[in-house]
Structures are given as C-alpha cells and as structure tokens.
Amino acid sequence: VSARYLAAAEKAGVKPLTTHRLSALRALMSTGSPLSEEGFDYVWRDIKPGIHLQSMSGGTDIISCFVLGNPWQPVNRGEIQGAGLGMDVAVYNEAGQPVVGEKGELVCRQSFPSMPVGFWNDTEDQQKYRAAYFEGFDNVWTHGDYAEQTANGGWIIYGRSDTVLNPGGVRIGTAEIYRQVEQVDEVLECVAVGQEWDGDIRIVLFVRLRDEATLDEALQARIRQIIRHGASPRHVPALMEQVLDIPRTLNGK
C-alpha cells in the first residue's frame, strides 16, 4: 500500500486491528513515498503489532528497489531495512564522498541487473540517458532521492532531490515537513515549494483542508509550532496558503 494511503487511513480513524482477523497477515509493504515514523506507529498500533513492516524505495525505470525490506533483519521505526541484492548503494555528500549519518544523494556505485542501458531515440552518445542519471557524479548512478544511511545500516528517504528546499543555504527534504503537517487533523494533504524571495529561498506551504476547516491564524500558528518542535525553525514555512486541491502526477504522486 502507499504511504499516503496509510496516513489517510490513520486520519480517518481506520483500525483494522479491531475490525478484522489478521492472524494470517505476516508482512505489510509500503511504497510510493517515504513512510513517516508516525506511519510506522500507526501500523504497529492499529493494524497489527509487531508485523514485518517493509518500506522501500526504487523506481519504475529500474524495475526494482535500491533499498527495501529484509525478513531476516529487525525493523527500526522510520527506517528502510537494507539495500537490494546486487545494489551497491550509498549516500554521497556534495563532494562525492560516501557518508553515514548525514543527508545526501542516494547513489548506486556499480551496474546492477535491472539497470536500463539507454533511452529510446536518444542521441548516439546517449546524452539524455547520461543527463538523467550520471551528471551528478562521474560513472555513478544518481537516482534523485535525498537520503541518509543510518549508523545501524538502515536507510531514510527524505524526498526527491529535485524537491529539496534550500532556505538560507540549508538543504531540507520536503518529506521532513510533510511528516509534521500530517499530524494536524484538519490537513488532508499539503505540498511545500521553494520560492525565490529577496535574494534567498523561502518556503511556501499549500494545504488542502477538511471541508469544515479554514486556514485561520490559529491553525497557521499550530502548524508552525508542530513543524518547529518536530523538525526545526528552518523548516517553518514563511507563507501558508489554503487550496482546493493538490496537483499530482499520472501515478498519483
């Protein structure tokens, strides 16, 4: 199931643990977007305590996952368990060095079994293909995910690199903001963008609310407080706007 579906189910008060017999359910897989720590809590509290919860990250283009679940390893709250078989995965900083415990670019350092070999109707020297995956670091597949490898071997995805915000020169993954805003009952969904403003970048947050809710000053203050407390003052949006809907890609992201 998608991480967004789990978040929506939690907000709707859905508790399969109390309405269904789930003794045969052994594992639950989450994909589509990063599963928040609160999403892990919801599954273990209201769906099935102790179930093997597998978040994952990959892509249609590779027909696979770079990082995913492993039935033989423990599951840590908010983390993906490990790298896929045949995937030489790492997180690179801006200098192209592998780092642990720091945020950076998710990369694969060697070819892998399901790696596409090119694009249809590309140039002879594969300009589009190389621009899509190999411009970031020389001969290293850069997948476009803003990620972190934890000290215990787990992985955290903070969102797509092309959606990373940079207010005051500090890189912020949009998922870091969404994880906090999802806690607000009045908010159905949201999207954060960076806007050039007075020589810097400011964060603008668009929110879709429940029908009876209004983005008044009190609700804005509560959202800002939750973001400030759960993330940092840097994550707090400079501007919030209420919208009727949020644009999506063809596959619902």
What are the residue ranges of the model-derived segments?
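Gly/Ser/Thr-rich phosphate-binding loop
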Residues: 8-75, 88, 95-96, 120-124
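Glycine-centered tight turns that cap/initiate beta-strands
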Residues: 24, 186-189, 245
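General small-molecule cofactor/ligand-binding pocket signal
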Residues: 54, 90, 240-243
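Short coil-to-beta-strand transition motifs
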Residues: 80-86, 141
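Conserved ATP/PPi-binding loop(s) of AMP-dependent carboxylate-activating enzymes
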Residues: 83-84, 97-134, 172
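AMP-binding/adenylate-forming catalytic core of the ANL superfamily
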Residues: 112, 139, 144-235
